[in-house]
UniProtKB/Swiss-Prot annotation:
It is found in: Cytoplasm. This is GTPase Obg. Residues 2-159 form the Obg domain. The gene is obg. It comes from Corynebacterium efficiens (strain DSM 44549 / YS-314 / AJ 12310 / JCM 11189 / NBRC 100395). Monomer. An essential GTPase which binds GTP, GDP and possibly (p)ppGpp with moderate affinity, with high nucleotide exchange rates and a fairly low GTP hydrolysis rate. Plays a role in control of the cell cycle, stress response, ribosome biogenesis and in those bacteria that undergo differentiation, in morphogenesis control.
């Protein structure tokens, strides 16, 4: 028998974006072919999709770690990398997606509804896409962004029309087994039912879904017994059925006190709910009372004696049944179908399935200077933190082994206004500035126009000294005259220094 799993924690890692390519077009008789490096492919997304063939979260219980494929790197001749294949995870209808803080992100109630649980990283731009008037043939490309990585909680709330509630051993499992094709475990001891059971009840040509949850006891809304874990399965039900054991011999218990105790637990659970199901609060939903075990003579006598009192006190319809003898079930079925049909008419019409997407907020150029802030670094006296989505993404895209790429990053940060704000915040040349996970020694940069003469892959602004030293001029002259070999530095300390400077 398959286990019913209604809560799991998923560890998700979407695919990383592919890196852009650095390439220069080479063709006969075309000496200035220009850059032709392609862009990297988008990383694969992780998507949750509601499937009618799935009824539990069991698969995720055994395989909670999920990783999507990465995008392919770009290539020369303007060839973009392939997009990483999206990974689709099928979930049952009624799945609620929460983040690690317990905040609801999506409620998947309709077959075919999709939710992008983790977005893949954007592919990096190739040098062809980075060409500009200042950089006609960039010698660098952008790295792909990493895919989103986080944990999500999936909770399953049954999409049943009728919910059976009652004390342990009240006969709920027996009742659902004779009213539907469900085959729950049945025993003559408390808490036989350890997981919710669902069954489809047929009434003529009409059907409705019934849910049997584990028995509730006083304090269930506070975590006692098994009730707290399974009360979520009655949140979406249109009608609640109190199944009362009229044959119970427990001291201090009677049908009316059982109903009052269960109503108190439902009211306490309702106060913790913040979801609008369109059905109203639990305390306002229709109720039906089922006095069970009428096959026992004493129980039948007690049920007939209390039936009028219960109807008068609570105002709910009361049915006397025997699940074992299968007596009194048809009137109960028709009454439940009538209430369910009325509730379905009142329920708001479901919208067409829509994809709910978790992704970085769109960038609005008009708010460019409001998209980051400068803070004092609490762990580094005299240091500064640049906090913002856009600069942190740029850090991830930068290849720090390439000076030209670093210079491009500096230009982007300056254009965003980071340098101006750092200067106003008191940053000085040499101050340590941290963006994302990278720390720099801040030095104000000149305009990107000055880099036009830089060889590919370099940025003259990053050189320690733009002037050629006397030793370098002397050595270049000796090489031209053939007095020394270009790679012959000789021996000794002076030669070592010249080798390092050259």
């Amino acid at each position: 028998m398959n286990r019913f799993i209604d809560r799991v924690v998923l560890h998700l890692a979407a695919g990383d974006g592919g890196n852009g390519c650095v390439s220069v077009h080479r063709e006969k008789f075309k000496p200035l072919g220009g850059p032709d490096g392609g862009n990297g492919g988008h990383g694969g997304d992780i998507i949750l999709e509601v499937s009618p063939q799935v009824h539990t979260l069991l698969d995720f219980h055994y395989h909670p770690h999920v990783k999507a494929p990465r995008g392919a790197n770009g290539a020369g001749d303007n060839r973009s990398g392939a997009r990483g294949e999206d990974l689709i995870l099928e979930v049952p209808a009624g799945t609620v997606v929460l983040n690690s803080k317990g905040e609801t992100l999506a409620d998947l109630t309709t077959v075919g509804m999709k939710f992008i649980a983790a977005a893949g990283g954007q592919g990096g731009l190739g040098n062809a896409a980075l060409a500009s008037r200042a950089r006609k043939a960039p010698g660098f490309a952008l790295n792909g962004e990493p895919g989103e990585q986080h944990d999500l909680i999936l909770e399953l709330k049954s999409m049943a029309d009728v919910g059976l509630v009652g004390f342990p051993s009240a006969g709920k499992s027996s009742l659902i087994s004779v009213m539907s094709a469900a085959k729950p475990k049945i025993g003559d001891y408390p808490f036989t039912t350890l997981q919710p059971n669902l069954g489809v009840v047929e009434v003529g040509h009409q059907t409705f879904i019934m849910a049997d949850v584990p028995g509730l006891i006083p304090g269930a809304s506070e975590g006692k017994g098994l009730g707290l874990d399974f009360l979520r399965h009655i949140e979406r039900t249109s009608v609640l059925v109190h199944v009362v054991d009229t044959a119970s011999m427990d001291p201090g218990r009677d049908p009316i006190s059982d109903i009052e105790a269960l109503e108190a637990e439902l009211a306490a659970y309702q106060s913790a709910l913040d979801e609008d199901t369109g059905l109203g609060d639990l305390d306002k939903r229709p109720r039906v009372v089922v006095l069970n075990k009428a096959d026992v003579p004493e129980a039948l006598e007690l049920a007939e004696f209390l039936k009028g009192d219960i109807e008068q006190q609570f105002g709910w319809p009361v049915f006397i049944v025997s699940a074992v003898a299968q007596r009194g079930l048809d009137p109960l079925k028709y009454k439940l179908l009538e209430i369910v049909q009325q509730a379905r008419k009142k329920r708001p019409k479901e919208k067409l399935a829509e994809s709910v997407i978790i992704k970085p907020k769109p960038v609005d150029g008009r708010r460019r200077r409001e998209e980051f802030e400068i803070r004092k670094d609490p762990d580094n006296p005299g240091g500064f933190l640049v906090v913002g989505e856009k600069p942190e993404r740029w850090i991830l895209q930068t290849d720090f082994e390439n000076d030209e790429a670093v210079g491009y990053l500096a230009d982007r940060l300056a254009k965003l206004g980071v340098e101006d704000k750092l200067r106003k915040a008191g940053a000085q040349t040499g101050s340590e500035v941290t963006i994302g996970g990278v720390t720099f020694e801040w030095e104000p940069m000149t305009s990107a126009v000055d880099t036009a003469a830089s060889p590919r892959g370099t940025d003259i602004r990053l050189e320690k000294n733009e002037r050629i030293s006397a030793a370098e001029r002397k050595r270049a002259s000796q090489v031209r005259r053939g007095l020394i070999d270009e790679f012959d530095y000789g021996d000794g300390e002076e030669a070592s220094r010249e080798r390092w400077e050259g």
